[in-house]
Amino acid sequence: MKSKRSRTYLVSGLTLALIFVAIILVFRDVLPDIVKDLSTVPFWGVLLLLALGFAYEAMESVLCLVIIHHKKPDCTFIDALRVTFLGVFGNITTLGAGTLPMQSFYLYRRGLDAGSGLGIMASEYVLHKISVLIYATVALLLGGDWLEQSASGLARYLLIGYVIGALIVIALTLLYTWDKVLDLVLLLFKKLPDTPKWNERREKWGSSLVQLNTEARKVLLVPSVRVRGIAVSLLKLFVLYSIPYLALRLAGCTALSFAEVQLLSSLMLLITSALPNVAGVGPMEFAFLLLFTPWADTAIASSALVLYRVATYFFPFLLSVIVFLREEKKSLKGFDAQSA
């Protein structure tokens, strides 16, 4: 058990170190300017950014609680908050592979079977994706003319990214809620090579999808849960999209209004959600600079990106490490008690 905890510390430390090194390499040309810009950021501004970052995770926990209450009404907001931060920890330290197992294990300890736990987390993921699409669509309808007039070249690529992101969200939603789409995917699995290795993978992937579809449908097809979940998600996204605006202002960019940053941020999340990433890093940073550099020079946009990721990535990860270690300690106590 001690070796397992040591590995946890090592993985957490290495993850942060690698990300820090990557940031240094990416921004090495403008690093002096970034340091200069960040040195002028007031302390209250940093605190407000961190508060918004925590508020986003708290709203994510409210969404989780809405879904959990459908299965287990006695679960509390603190339970949902722990599930959320365990997800943050698993996504970063295990490159996403351990996210669902960590969250499902916690829910299992709270009295939910493994299938229900997986269904809850899958439902939360789908509701989040649906809300991202709704928010981006409304923002684009309201601000599309401004985007076309102020950045026509960029708008063309953003529209393509929007369409691709929308198609992925729709396909994902149908996969979890419509049996015909699930049957189609399972049929495609049968086209994979007929070898022992691929047969094992096909069986594993197919059974996982069937289980997720079965459990997620129990939640997603309940109107009250669906409506409340999307409402909470939209409010959560409003908080998230407010962080780039504050980061840009603190870095010295005043060319964009609050509504314009909301539009660009909503498109940024929709597009990057459809792209592969490593531990939540890569596409988001690229998209942030691509979208906001036209209205701020590279150094200011890069400084704003650092502030944004501190609030939405590093700070939540730090909190998630604390939550994980506390939950691991409780698990070890329970294991020792059973052994005795």
Label the model's feature ranges.
Residues 32-38, 208-221:
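A short amphipathic helical element positioned immediately N-terminal to and/or at the very start
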Residues 1-36, 87-199, 277, 281-340:
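Transmembrane helix-loop-helix hairpins in multi-pass inner-membrane proteins
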Residues 6-10, 40-48, 217-231:
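Membrane-interface helix starts
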Residues 5-6, 42-44, 73-82, 113-114, ...:
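Membrane-helix interface segments
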Residues 46-50, 77, 81-82, 118, ...:
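Hydrophobic alpha-helical transmembrane segments
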Residues 216-267, 275:
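Transmembrane helical segments that form the transport core of multi-pass membrane transport proteins
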Residues 59-85, 89, 247-264:
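Membrane-embedded helical hairpins/re-entrant loop segments and their flanking transmembrane helices
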Residues 49-56, 87-91, 128, 232-236, ...:
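Alpha-helical transmembrane segments of multi-pass integral membrane proteins
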